[in-house]
Amino acid sequence: MKATSKIMYSMATFLAIMAIIYLFATMHVEDSGYMVGYEWAGGVCMILGTLLTVMLGGYLHFTENRIDVLPEDWEEAEVADAAGTLGFFSPSSIWPLAMSGAIAVLGFGIVYMHYWLIAIGAVLLIYTTTMLNLQYGIPKEKH
């Protein structure tokens, strides 16, 4: 967590510097087809991005002070110290491929604004997600 909060603080510093540069750059650019002065949309986004990274860095910093030393902060830690339980892996499941196809159908429906294709893709995605979650909860004769 200590390294993560330092990364967030350094990102916030970078974004603050870029926001200041953006402020001065947009104030001195004059375009006859556009209004002269500070460009608000980009400037507000830069400032809000800075504030959000400061907020996240502060949260990580305060959380790090209240917990024990994590394996990534301990210099003598092994890789196995941070490794958790991976759980069960199904190497022969067809449902991730089917979900990819359903997402592709849904994506094509959204791209081309075909509502019938969006509906079919959504139904397929719900069905394939359900089957992925229930593939070992259904008896073998129902597969």
UniProtKB/Swiss-Prot annotation:
<keyword id="KW-1003">Cell membrane</keyword>
<feature type="transmembrane region" description="Helical">
    <location>
        <begin position="106"/>
        <end position="126"/>
    </location>
</feature>
<feature type="transmembrane region" description="Helical">
    <location>
        <begin position="85"/>
        <end position="105"/>
    </location>
</feature>
<keyword id="KW-1133">Transmembrane helix</keyword>
<comment type="similarity">
    <text>Belongs to the cytochrome c oxidase bacterial subunit CtaF family.</text>
</comment>
<comment type="function">
    <text>Part of cytochrome c oxidase, its function is unknown.</text>
</comment>
<feature type="transmembrane region" description="Helical">
    <location>
        <begin position="40"/>
        <end position="60"/>
    </location>
</feature>
<comment type="subunit">
    <text>Associates with subunits I, II and III to form cytochrome c oxidase.</text>
</comment>
<dbReference type="GO" id="GO:0022900">
    <property type="term" value="P:electron transport chain"/>
</dbReference>
<keyword id="KW-0472">Membrane</keyword>
<protein>
    <recommendedName>
        <fullName>Cytochrome c oxidase polypeptide 4</fullName>
        <ecNumber>7.1.1.9</ecNumber>
    </recommendedName>
</protein>
<feature type="transmembrane region" description="Helical">
    <location>
        <begin position="7"/>
        <end position="27"/>
    </location>
</feature>
<dbReference type="GO" id="GO:0004129">
    <property type="term" value="F:cytochrome-c oxidase activity"/>
</dbReference>
<keyword id="KW-1278">Translocase</keyword>
<dbReference type="InterPro" id="IPR021050">
    <property type="entry name" value="Cyt_c_oxidase_su4_actinobac"/>
</dbReference>
<dbReference type="Pfam" id="PF12270">
    <property type="entry name" value="Cyt_c_ox_IV"/>
</dbReference>
<keyword id="KW-0812">Transmembrane</keyword>
<dbReference type="GO" id="GO:0005886">
    <property type="term" value="C:plasma membrane"/>
</dbReference>
